[in-house]
Each structure stands twice: as C-alpha cells, then as structure tokens.
Amino acid sequence: MLYEKFEYNINNLIGNFGLSKMSIAVSGGSDSVALLYLANIWAEKNNIELFVISVDHNLREQSKQETHYIQNISNSLNRKHYSLSFDHQNNFSNLQERAREGRYDLMTNLCLELDILVLLTAHHEDDYVENFCLRLERNSGIFGLSSSNINWYNNIHIIRPLYNIPKSELVEYLVSHNIKWFEDESNSSDKYRRNVIRQKLAKGADYIRHFSKPVYREEFKGDTERSTAAYTSVGEEALLRGPVKLTVSSRGLTTVKTIKSTNNFSIFNWIPWSSHGMTEVKLIHATMPREDASTGTASKLSLEAKCGKMSKAAIISQQLKTNKRIENEFKPELISAIAEAVKIFEYGFAFLDLVKFDKFSNEVKVQIINFLLIIISGQSRAARFYSVEPILKLITQDVNFKNTLHGCIIKRIQNELLIYREFGKKLPESKILLDKSVIWDNRFCITKNQETPNCFVTHLSLKDYKIIKKQLDLEPLKNLSCKNHNAVLLTLPIIKILEKVIAIPHISYYDNDMWNFEVSFSPNFVSRFTHFC
C-alpha cells in the first residue's frame, strides 16, 4: 500500500524530531497533490498542524487556477494555505534555476516567519533518476552524482518522503481516489533535456547518455581511488560510531568529542557565534555499515553507465551504490576535513590549513572549498568545478597568491588559505532595523537590545572609515586575520542613523554608551552533505 510506504519513509526521515507543525510545498501537479493527501493522513494520525504552501511563478496562464485549486483542497482538509508569488521581473535568462531558487527563498522565509522547521517536497523516485542522468552528462563527481532525501535550505529542513516511490504509483493513487490534478504542458516539451530523459524512461526505454567534454583534467582528477584513511584528529572510531561535537571560540575550532546522535541524517549544525564569549558547533553524521567502505567499488560507474546506456533499474542501482559510498567513506572524510583543517571566525572570514588539507581526497577538497565559499559569500549556490579547479592548482604550486571567486577574496599566506568576503560591484543591500533583529548580507544576524529610532544596517564606506578610524581598536582583528584587518573590516555590518556610524558591534565600537547591539555570523547555508544554522 502506498500510504504504508509513505508512512515508513517519513517516520524514518523525521525520527524523534518532536514536531507540532510542518509545511508542505504543493504546486497542483500529480506528485505534490498526492503528497498533500498522504501527508494530511499522517499529520492527523500524529496530531501535527500542516501548512500548505503554493508558489505562483507567473509564467503560465493556468498557474492561478492551480493555486485556487490547492486552496480549495486545503480548505476541504481544514489546512491553512499560503499563496506566494515569484517575480521574474521579465528576465528569462537561466529562468529554471532562478525560479527554483526564488521558490525556495519564498517558502523557507515563510517557514521562518511561522516558526516551522520542516518543509515536505514531492521529489519522487523518477526525479532522482532524472537528476542522476543529468549530472552524469555534466561529468559530476561522486558528490554530484549522489542524492539525499534530506536537505537544508535557509536553515529549514527539506524532507522528501517520496524518494523511493515512482510517479506511476502516485498517479494510480489519485485515480483510484478520484482526485484531480493539473498537468504542466512544459513537461512535454523537448526543449529541456530533463523532459527527453523523462519521456524515454516513462516508455520503458533505456537512457542514452549524451557525452560532453570531460570536466576533470589530467592535473586534477576527481573520484580518486584510495583506501580509507584513519581520521586522526577526530578518530576513526568516533566518526564511524557516531557524531562529534566541536567546541568553537573566536579563535576557531578547538576541541572534538563524540556526542549522542539525535536523528538518522547528516547535519553540520552551527549554533551562531555571539559577539561575546564562546559557543558550540555540532557536527553530526549518520552511522552506516562499514562494508565496502575500504574497497572503493561503490564509486566505480557500471559498464552500462560508462558506455552511456542504462535501464531505469540500472540507474537506481548505481545511485544507491553511489549514495552508499558517500555515506561510508566520503562524508566521514569531509567531516574530518572540516574538523581538522578549517577555522571559521565570527568576523565572517575563514582560514584553511593547507598542510592538513593536502592529505584529503580531491573530491573532498572540492567540497571543502565550496563549503567555505558558500559560507563566506552568503550565496546559496556552489561554484562550478571549472571555477574551483584553478584555485586547487594554485594551491599545489606552493606560492602565495590572491584571487577572487564566488564573491570572495582567496589569499594564500604561507601554509594557510584566507577566505573573506568581496563586495565587488554589487554592494550588500542596507537593512532597516525595524524589528528586534535582521539578517544582513545573508551572513550576519544583528539584534538590537534597545529601541533605536531610524537606524539601519549597512557596510563601512572608506569615507566613514576615515572619519572614525582613530577611535577603532582593530588589534584583535588584525592578529586574527594576519594583518588583513582593514579589508575584513569593510565587509562587517555597521549601524547608522542618517549619515552617522553609531556602532560596529564586531569590534565593540559605539559612539554612545546607550547603544547595545549583538551580532552573530549566521549565513544561509545550502548543502546535501553538511549544515549549520
């Protein structure tokens, strides 16, 4: 029975989360409508309040009909419905990616407003198969080819309980219960490669891979074959048997110890730094059987995949093997690499220990660089491999350098890599402090502890810096950043009233004793492998 399979999935994915409410993304298509009815049954059984969210992308005439239909279903199920609207601003370049990002921004921001931690989405087995094929054609490494049923976006837990259920079962469920849904006409267009793959697999035909030029060059190959190393800093036993806790101060990572697991999923949970004192980082990973962890066989694509012809069953099998190797080998290595080689500071910059970094596999090296670029830049998408590859090559040359990438300055200083924010031509938007707290530049959370009229958060301009520089104590920042304090200072949030700088909380600068602000480094991080919030 479909519901029993769904119930088993969602119970395993959520675990003992202690939820009283959750949200669900519903578009009007067969997948999400089926998910809505299944989730409604489960929510009733578990006494959970379910909030239904629809996003109108304003691209199709029938989209408003779909939203109205979902609202009617929600009302009939006695569930609250929220209709959101994506503004494409008549910009149709890279529209699919922008629409997806905009959709998740809208939905997760609403979840934060409603104090909801979990968002259900209707990604099903066929979606995972299509994604695998598309990533294979893009020459993705093993991390790119893997899939996850649990993701994080904007610190919201994205759960996909239909991951092992084919679309045909969802359609059959709707038909048998006389439930209507909408078909998106664009899904039948040959314009998109995904649709071509979908149509072939739906007819039971084999997937024929489109080969593109190799992304991995001879100088730097991903998915290297190697035996599993002992992770000395954290300890292999700790990584394989359970999660670890990292204690953090303003000087970076200091201690590591094993803690008890809370769920069956992997997260890198960063409780943001306060501008005063110390806090913790919880580094958690799911434990899985160690069989095959040291053989490396799971990472090898099947002969069918290499030849470019696979059945749907073969694709699913290859996906499972890939996922297993990620869980057994690469994810523990990634966790170990972050614990050993990375230091992230409350000022929004990071150092990477290149001596320790060098011992990890190339696939993990790419993930670490992207991990840092996303955190420091505040962006929600990772850099492409072809952009990261030159940095990795420079690192191997053992010479100091300074480059820009993905909204960051990357600077080698002897055996360390310093990464800090670069504004470039696109300066961060100023934010008015109307509420008690505000997120600025997708990185910092600023909280006011008193009523402050007409103040706003922005960055420090050179003009303002010249006016107040003699009043600033930059010695701590200077020491921590290896004398890059001036560059880092210009990336920090400041509070102004009209044209006057009244506070720079990071360096404890206040022009008046009455002001009191707190700041924490809390970027909107997106990952299938690690997370912090």
From Swiss-Prot:
Chief localization: cytoplasm
This enzyme's EC code(s): 6.3.4.19
Positions with a binding annotation for ATP: 27-32
InterPro entries (alphabetical): Rossmann-like_a/b/a_fold, RPE1, TilS/TtcA_N, tRNA_Ile_lys_synt, tRNA_Ile_lys_synt_N
Enzyme class: ligase
Domain of life: Bacteria
Subcellular location: Cytoplasm
Catalytic activity: cytidine(34) in tRNA(Ile2) + L-lysine + ATP = lysidine(34) in tRNA(Ile2) + AMP + diphosphate + H(+)
Keyword Signal: no
GO cellular component: cytoplasm
Sections of the chain in a coiled coil: none
The entry's keywords: ATP-binding, Cytoplasm, Ligase, Nucleotide-binding, tRNA processing
UniProt GO molecular function: ATP binding; tRNA(Ile)-lysidine synthase activity
GO biological-process terms attached to the record: tRNA modification
Function: Ligates lysine onto the cytidine present at position 34 of the AUA codon-specific tRNA(Ile) that contains the anticodon CAU, in an ATP-dependent manner. Cytidine is converted to lysidine, thus changing the amino acid specificity of the tRNA from methionine to isoleucine.
NCBIfam families: lysidine_TilS_N (TIGR02432), RPE1 (TIGR01045)
Domain notes: The N-terminal region contains the highly conserved SGGXDS motif, predicted to be a P-loop motif involved in ATP binding.
Entry's family note: Belongs to the tRNA(Ile)-lysidine synthase family.
Protein name: tRNA(Ile)-lysidine synthase
UniProt source species: Rickettsia peacockii (strain Rustic)
Organism taxonomic ancestry: Bacteria, Pseudomonadati, Pseudomonadota, Alphaproteobacteria, Rickettsiales
